[in-house]
């Protein structure tokens, strides 16, 4: 009968095995520790035995000679073994370094072989193309030399790659050869070199001209803000200026370059004198060379003004349109004589009847230019420079006028209404024909800087004329004039213009809008191509009386070259209130004022010979020199 093993006995057996294993492990650890201790003790005893053997050797103990030799022999053997191991390790390290260097050299050789194959392939291909030319022209001249140089470079490159002797100088030689080949490849044919030089010379000359144009002149303090604008010109702007200048006749350019030495000496003497008032400061001689550029443009503008005066004015105004047909021939004569224009005097101009012909004043300009002192050699750049300065100085002038009027209103009480009759002056001072040009040319009484002074006279006179036309339109009581024209009431209009200029707020200076548009229309870079004014709308209001406010008037001025349609007049205040006869009379007066505006603009474009400047009679003015224009206009018309 079989008896089954008890599970408890098996568990006990397993526990016994585990305990035995643990005991054995502990014993093994103890034996290892004992072995380490014994080893340490052996090393210590060996060291002590070695030291004792050395000491005994010193004392020459014959008894312990064998023991001493054995001890020392064992020590020497151990030291030799250690030295051998160290030597082997050093040799192994050297061998490893040598292996690495050889492996690096092998990789470099493989790279050289690959480059040599590529170079030989390119050389073979190049020689095939060289020996079998398709085009006979390519086998001669510069192309053949370039191909031979390329083949020489490839052959040398292959030789240097495959020759191990020149490994050290390989990099330097390759760099030198590559530079030489690049120079050969980049060197164009002689014809191409000449073409490139011809193309580069005009650009360089244009750059030098542009820089010299901005730096060679001797500007005054008033012209300093414009210097930065001229330096920033580009080549295409200078080209445009040259193209515009090339359209002028050659004779005009020759006349503009003729400067008598008298004016130059006068200019040098006047530079050393004390500063003068801004209204009468001297201009440089270079200003005179810009007159010719505008003469052709003036003739066409005068023609447009003549068309307006002929087609849309009554017969009596045709007779009194300031002699456009008679003055055109005088303008051509002035065109040939305007090359040397006298500068403005330092004081008010004294006009003598015997010295100045009556008809010669028709060619006078009443507005000096604002250009800086440029030498005559840079006359072609005038049209480009003027457009930039015109825009900047116009904006600055508007702000200056507003500030001056605000200061006058703050400092002085409201000026009383001026008398409707202007003070009389001696008729011997000014000829009768000169009244046609200067009776609507008052200058601003405010103190403006030298930089803005040339604009003040032009723009203030333009405001006066526009204000006169506004008063003509806005005055229903004067519509039915006994004489049919407004010449009899010129003194009344004159006083109303003065009052309106003295009492208008800065916000009502609407003619400045027209002023900026006219400046941009006449003086912009492409102004010579426009040949006329663009449609300019001028809206303004005038207070003819302190108690009565006239309605807002809008006047549309559309003068242009070859204009065949009559100018449009939009009058919101007269719609349905005025009769047909009164509307025609008002329209005739407005057209006549339009003719005067165009003629005054024509007078102001070139440089002036004389300028008759007089001031408004204000609360602080000591005297007013204003010609009795009403009486003289009546005498001329009557």
From Swiss-Prot:
SMART domains: DUF1220
PROSITE patterns in the cross-refs: ODV
Lineage of producing organism: Eukaryota, Metazoa, Chordata, Craniata, Vertebrata
Regions of compositional bias (Acidic residues) in chain numbering: 165-179
Alphabetized Pfam families for the sequence: Olduvai
GO CC, alphabetical: cytoplasm
Localization terms from the record: Cytoplasm
Low complexity bias locations: 214-226
Name of the protein: NBPF family member NBPF6
Organism: Homo sapiens
UniProt similarity note: Belongs to the NBPF family.
Skewed-composition ranges (Basic and acidic residues): 192-202, 232-251, 264-273
InterPro entries recorded: NBPF, Olduvai_dom
Further comment: Encoded by one of the numerous copies of NBPF genes clustered in the p36, p12 and q21 region of the chromosome 1.
Residue numbers spanned by region Disordered: 157-285, 563-584
Keywords assigned by UniProt, alphabetized: Coiled coil, Cytoplasm, Repeat
Domain Olduvai, chain residue ranges per copy: 174-261, 326-399, 400-503
Coiled coil: 10-43, 69-115
